[in-house]
Each structure stands twice: as C-alpha cells, then as structure tokens.
Design a protein with these regions (language model features):
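Residue-level detector of conserved catalytic or cofactor/ligand-binding positions
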Residues: 208-218
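Alpha-helical substrate-binding/gating segment
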Residues: 177-186, 199-210
Length: 218
C-alpha cells in the first residue's frame, strides 16, 4: 500500500493524480513533513515500513530569495521523517529488518563542473554553492548519520535535472516550452554557457523503484 504525503504548496496539483486516486492500494495524505507529531501518527496508522523521500523545496532562485524555508523543509523536514521512522521501526517486532529510508538528493551538492571532461561520482567532495544545494547537503548528512548512529537502512541517490508532464512551469524545460508557445523571449542564465543533464521522469521513477526494491528486498 502506497501512502503519498504532500503539503501541496504552490507547485503541487492533485489533478495530476486523477488516474490513480481511486486505486485500493493508494492513499493521499495532505500534510507537512515538518509536522513531526503528524508524521509519527501516520507511521503508526499505516504501519509504514519504507520511505521514499522526495519532498523538498527545489528551486535554486527561490532559495536565494528565501533560504529559511529551504532549511526548514529540506533539513528539518528530513530530520522529522528520519526521527519518526526511527521511533516506529526501533520499537517494531522486527526492528530495522526489511525497513528502508530512501532519500533522493541532487547532484547540486557536488558544486559545478569545469569544461574539462571531468564528472562527479558518489565519492566527490560536497561543495554546495546555493542555499538550495546547501540544504540538500545538510539533509544528506542527516540521513547518513542516522545510518551510522542508529543502524537505520538507508539509500541516498543524487539526481540531475528531471523533466516531464505536468512539471511546474518555473522549471527550465516547461518554461521554455510555454514561452515558445506564447511568443515570449527565452531566458538566458549567466552567459548562456551552462550545461545541464536532463532525466525523464518515467526513467527516474523506474530507477527509484528498482533501487528501493533491490535494497529493501521487499
């Protein structure tokens, strides 16, 4: 059974989930991951044994204007989920057996690449350059700390830019498409020399599912 928890901030839209809302193995819950007591209650109510954590503030420009909300959601929200999972799983009959906290991060925690053919690996030193990437780096460290300190089974993966249907139009690809459709100018960031990798949402979702199933052995 899948419990989909979302605060439904400005970029959220329940209409995107119309085709699955009536499925018997799916439940939507409108809640804030920073609401610790509510998260604890949900773990108890639904006997949650696995978390795939994608909830985050993710727009770099917005993080520059208001870094506090990024620290609150991305760092404290992640800590709220981790602590709720710890309390629920440590006291269960099977402990951490067949439990998993899967945390989706970003390649932005590694900083920027030069045009010299180098690339990031999971061993690359963290060098976040924006409040957004700094908040995600902080959440990554908390996830790994819960593994090292309490033995919680975790995965951390680092995605590049995602795109796909229904994406909020502040993101680059839907922004470009909308501007082209309406005859508006296309924005140029910096000197226009930035290079980005893009991952289609279906491929990303399949990868997350496979990683989760393999690690959790569910």
């Amino acid at each position: 059974h899948i419990i989909n928890l979302d605060k439904l901030t400005y970029a959220g839209n329940l209409a995107n989930l119309k085709d699955i809302e009536g499925q018997p193995n799916y439940t939507f819950v409108k809640a804030d991951i920073c609401d610790f007591e509510r998260i604890i209650q949900l773990f108890k109510q639904y006997n949650i044994d696995s978390v795939i954590h994608l909830a985050a503030e993710s727009h770099v420009d917005r993080s520059i204007k208001d870094p506090f909300i990024f620290a609150q959601t991305n760092v404290m929200g992640t800590l709220s989920l981790l602590q709720a999972a710890k309390l629920a799983w440590e006291t269960s009959e099977t402990g951490y057996d067949h439990k998993l906290f899967y945390h989706i991060s970003t390649d932005e925690v590694y900083g920027a690449l030069d045009f010299d053919g180098t690339f990031f690996t999971e061993q690359t030193k963290y060098q976040p350059h924006s409040p957004y990437s700094a908040s995600k780096a902080g959440s990554d460290h908390f996830v790994r700390a819960f593994h090292d300190t309490y033995g919680m089974p975790v995965i951390v993966t680092n995605c590049s830019n995602n795109y796909g249907p229904y994406q909020f139009p502040e993101k680059l690809i839907p922004l470009f498409i909308n501007n082209i459709r309406h005859g508006k100018a296309l924005p140029v960031y910096g000197k226009g020399e930035n290079v980005r990798d893009w991952l289609y949402v279906v491929a990303v979702s399949y990868t997350h599912l496979r990683a989760h199933e393999t690690k959790a052995n569910l």
